[in-house]
Amino acid sequence: MAWRRREASVGARGVLALALLALALCVPGARGRALEWFSAVVNIEYVDPQTNLTVWSVSESGRFGDSSPKEGAHGLVGVPWAPGGDLEGCAPDTRFFVPEPGGRGAAPWVALVARGGCTFKDKVLVAARRNASAVVLYNEERYGNITLPMSHAGTGNIVVIMISYPKGREILELVQKGIPVTMTIGVGTRHVQEFISGQSVVFVAIAFITMMIISLAWLIFYYIQRFLYTGSQIGSQSHRKETKKVIGQLLLHTVKHGEKGIDVDAENCAVCIENFKVKDIIRILPCKHIFHRICIDPWLLDHRTCPMCKLDVIKALGYWGEPGDVQEMPAPESPPGRDPAANLSLALPDDDGSDDSSPPSASPAESEPQCDPSFKGDAGENTALLEAGRSDSRHGGPIS
């Protein structure tokens, strides 16, 4: 389970990294550029010929051009003077009509031209050749009160602004009537507009779709693996439980000191390679091989066969398929007159030294074989201590 948790953690970090990448790309200005522009304050003033009153209005309704110096300008308003009524001021020889109050001459003036017909740069250069102090372009009628960015690189230090169509037509009509109109231009509010370029939008969309596909594929793979692993764990636990019940039918014997025991040619456990000691609990397989119980039970749970002769112990007990696929066989009954819990003994030397080697009597703690402690929990579950004795006509004592 640990490696699966690590795999899930790595996958989650990958998804998080992709999400952070997409968010970073979506931050305004991350892949695009910032647009900075300034609004213009437009102040117009004139004398109404009917009432002889001065009329003036101030509004922040203009917008400076991209290449225009952000500074103020002042002068009388002049409009293109052409026989055909060309108000766009595109022709190189365009002349401007500037009504002057009181017949004064050589006063600073501001060119008012309509948008269209040529580039912004051409309009500005034509007015600059006529010594205009500033150029005011009014937008087309279809845009209403909207002003748009203007690109006019290479026009020098002349002030260039754009005003809306209604505002431009209002001033134009006054000038065409011969009314002198004075315009004062001031610097308005600074605006910063950040945006993402079209290529960045496409890139972010592709990255997001890729992230979603990878995340979905990883989640599907993860949950399929988790489902399969959970199913195998449940099946394995059920199988081990049934196998423990079958192994519990094998006979158990307790080693006693000083008694002649069963006729088995074995002095030690083939699993832990330790000699059998007093009070050791051993298990005898159908093939007559003996092992420590805490050593052989975990082995049989995993392999089902005798470690020495490879006999299938489960089949030898009458289970031809998986332990859970057949019914349990009844445990063998003990012979009449015998206590089924009686201990059988293994041949060990007496204390008087009559045998070749006489190991000292071991305490219960010392006589326990040094098998893997992790096996003890599995080996102790569902284990039945079945002990039976048989009489030997020759010795009159316990035999194998």
Curated annotation (Swiss-Prot):
Give the reactions, separated by semicolons, that this protein catalyses. Answer: S-ubiquitinyl-[E2 ubiquitin-conjugating enzyme]-L-cysteine + [acceptor protein]-L-lysine = [E2 ubiquitin-conjugating enzyme]-L-cysteine + N(6)-ubiquitinyl-[acceptor protein]-L-lysine
Functional pathway: Protein modification; protein ubiquitination
Q: Which EC number(s) does UniProt give?
A: 2.3.2.27
Q: Where is this region: Disordered?
A: 325-400
Write out the GO MF terms.
Answer: ubiquitin protein ligase activity; zinc ion binding
Biased-composition ranges, Low complexity, are: 356-368
Residues that span the membrane, as ranges: 201-221
Q: Which residues, renumbered to this chain, carry the PTM Phosphoserine?
A: 345
Q: Which Pfam families does its entry note?
A: PA, zf-RING_2
Q: What is the effect of changing residue 7 to K?
A: In a breast cancer sample; somatic mutation
Q: Which residues form the signal peptide?
A: 1-32
Q: Which domain of life is it from?
A: Eukaryota
Q: Which residues form the PA domain?
A: 67-175
Q: What is its main location?
A: membrane
Name a single GO cellular component. endoplasmic reticulum
Keywords assigned: Glycoprotein, Membrane, Metal-binding, Phosphoprotein, Signal, Transferase, Transmembrane, Transmembrane helix, Ubl conjugation pathway, Zinc, Zinc-finger
Membrane topology qualifier: Single-pass membrane protein
- Regions of biased composition (Basic and acidic residues) lie at 389-400
| Functional summary from the UniProt entry | E3 ubiquitin-protein ligase. Ubiquitinates BRAF, inducing its proteasomal degradation.
Question: How are the domains described in the entry?
Answer: The RING-type zinc finger domain mediates binding to an E2 ubiquitin-conjugating enzyme.
User: Could you tell me what this protein is called?
Assistant: E3 ubiquitin-protein ligase RNF149
The source organism is Homo sapiens
- Taxonomic lineage from the root: Eukaryota, Metazoa, Chordata, Craniata, Vertebrata
